[in-house]
Amino acid sequence: MNRCAEAAAVAATVPGSGVGDAGLRPPMVPRQASFFPPPVPNPFVQQTTISASRRLQMFLLGIILLPVRALLVGIILLLAWPFAVISTACCPEKLTHPISNWRRKITRPALTFLARAMFFSMGFTVTVKGKVASPLEAPIFVVAPHSTFFDGIACVVAGLPSLVSRNENAQTPLVGRLLRALQPVLVSRVDPDSRKNTINEIKKRATSGGEWPQILVFPEGTCTNRSCLITFKPGAFIPGVPVQPVLLRYPNKLDTVTWTWQGYTFLQLCVLTFCQLFTKVEIEFMPVQAPSEEEKNDPVLFASRIRNLMAEALEIPVTDHTYEDCRLMISAGQLTLPMEAGLVEFSKISRKLKLDWDGIRKHLDEYASIASSSKGGRIGIEEFAEYLKLPVSDVLRQLFALFDRNNDGSIDFREYVIGLAVLCNPANTEEIIQVAFKLFDVDEDGYITEEEFCTILQASLGVPDLNVSGLFREIAQRDSVSYEEFKSFALKHPEYAKIFTTYLDLQTCHVFSLPEEVQTAPSVASNKVSPESQEEGTSDKKVD
């Protein structure tokens, strides 16, 4: 019997290496509660079902209400424009000083009245709870959940404080001038220093002692369906000043206001809302919350406490989704995956796994190449095996089960990212790569031939007629594979390292299940897998 045959014979004795073995050991890596799926899988989608009777009612009301309300909104905006001009005349777009008192005294009452009239003309009935804090009590309002462009009504009720807005919005005709009258903090998407400048500007205004107007911030940074509170951005909490949480509720039987990434468009929502007899909104001003000394030094901690406080009052859960999840949703759609496939709870995953946007986006490309052929944009065992160019075996099922955290028989993108970071990358060490190379290099000449490669894989996976020529050619540049080529391929494909360590775990379990005299018997495979000498082979397996 040659060396290949000896190694194959030993590998084939491992229980679980054959396809027909019944039962698999449970995953050896414990599930971390912090990686459990979020209570709300997708807060960026809204599906509103409108019955036939409601459609008829909206059509009949809309014949009268839609044109009248649209006309009134247009008239009010035109009436507000001169006051906005007076407020901002001869002022730079990015203010370095607050608008003078005489301008504010003339324009603020008029703009507040017209803004209230506009929302009233659109059919909004507003219920206000709590007391609005003064600039000295709370320089910053934090408003959540942010679910629609109609949330601007909170700004009106709060007395027209300053907003944080995109620089492009200030360039919009008519609306841009009205926005500038609020003395907004403008954010530029092309300026690399914009984030730092925005934080500094918020801090300067919040600590001005009432010289500047209060600032109203939507800390979620994007619109959701109000089913949860997503991660709060720390910008409003960095100054370390007291904030007043503001809750928004829309207690309507038919939701015509929610504006999410998947749902009705801006124009559709305007039409649907204008066709309602009225739209109810509740605005609750909660007690002012001052940061502790620890929270002043840790704005993320401060933001987390305020979010939990608001979520408790709203009786909804919190998740670690962010605006970056929306970007991943768009990327998933461009890769022909369902948009929701890109959701990973970016804030949690990036923090716990030390992954940045570019790293997760790269994993999405990899995931799409595997899952694009499957239904629903999820990886099944067949797609997993096809990607690895290996048959469905118990070793492969072990690895698949480790990735499949919720045991639903498929791997979603979130599970894929966690699996690579938690399972595969730690297993893909220099030592493991060396051990794997030694196992395949049966004749110990420093190269792996296709015969050696096929023989070991066929035996360890329990598939004697396995064709792995395609996988071998992907690794090899010539007729054999050097250690450097083997290492380069392993580093680019960490999934194979986990397959190998899973195989070693199964082999170790088998050794311990044998009688003591058999455990101490030397074998080709044990000598090659263990980096130590033959005499220490058994103890090394225990360490594994």
UniProtKB/Swiss-Prot annotation:
SMART domains in the record: EFh, PlsC
Residues exposed to the Lumenal side: 80-544
Keyword Endoplasmic reticulum: yes
Subcellular location: Endoplasmic reticulum membrane; Golgi apparatus membrane; Cell membrane; Lipid droplet
Skewed-composition ranges (Polar residues): 520-532
Transmembrane segments: 59-79
PROSITE patterns: EF_HAND_1, EF_HAND_2
Positions that bind Ca(2+) 2: 441, 443, 445, 447, 452
Residues that bind Ca(2+) 1: 404, 406, 408, 410, 415
Distribution of this protein across tissues and organs: Highest expression is found in resident macrophages and casein-induced neutrophils followed by skin, colon, spleen and thioglycollate-induced macrophages. Detected in erythroleukemic cells but not in reticulocytes.
Temperature-dependence annotation: Optimum temperature is 7.4 degrees Celsius.
Motif (HXXXXD motif): 146-151
Regulation: Acetyltransferase activity is increased following acute inflammatory stimulation by lipopolysaccharide (LPS). Acyltransferase activity is unchanged.
Region Disordered, residue ranges: 520-544
Pathway as given in its UniProt record: Lipid metabolism; phospholipid metabolism
Membrane topology: Single-pass type II membrane protein
GO cellular component terms listed in the entry, alphabetical order: endoplasmic reticulum; endoplasmic reticulum membrane; Golgi membrane; Golgi stack; lipid droplet; membrane; plasma membrane
Span(s) of short sequence motif EGTC motif: 220-223
Keyword annotations from UniProtKB, A to Z: Acyltransferase, Calcium, Cell membrane, Endoplasmic reticulum, Golgi apparatus, Lipid biosynthesis, Lipid droplet, Lipid metabolism, Membrane, Metal-binding, Phospholipid biosynthesis, Phospholipid metabolism, Repeat, Signal-anchor, Transferase, Transmembrane, Transmembrane helix
GO biological process: membrane organization; phosphatidylcholine acyl-chain remodeling; platelet activating factor biosynthetic process
Keyword Methyltransferase: no
Enzyme class, UniProt record, top EC level: transferase
Main function: Exhibits both acyltransferase and acetyltransferase activities. Activity is calcium-dependent. Catalyzes the conversion of lysophosphatidylcholine (1-acyl-sn-glycero-3-phosphocholine or LPC) into phosphatidylcholine (1,2-diacyl-sn-glycero-3-phosphocholine or PC). Catalyzes the conversion 1-acyl-sn-glycerol-3-phosphate (lysophosphatidic acid or LPA) into 1,2-diacyl-sn-glycerol-3-phosphate (phosphatidic acid or PA) by incorporating an acyl moiety at the sn-2 position of the glycerol backbone.
Family: Belongs to the 1-acyl-sn-glycerol-3-phosphate acyltransferase family.
Protein name per its UniProtKB record: Lysophosphatidylcholine acyltransferase 2
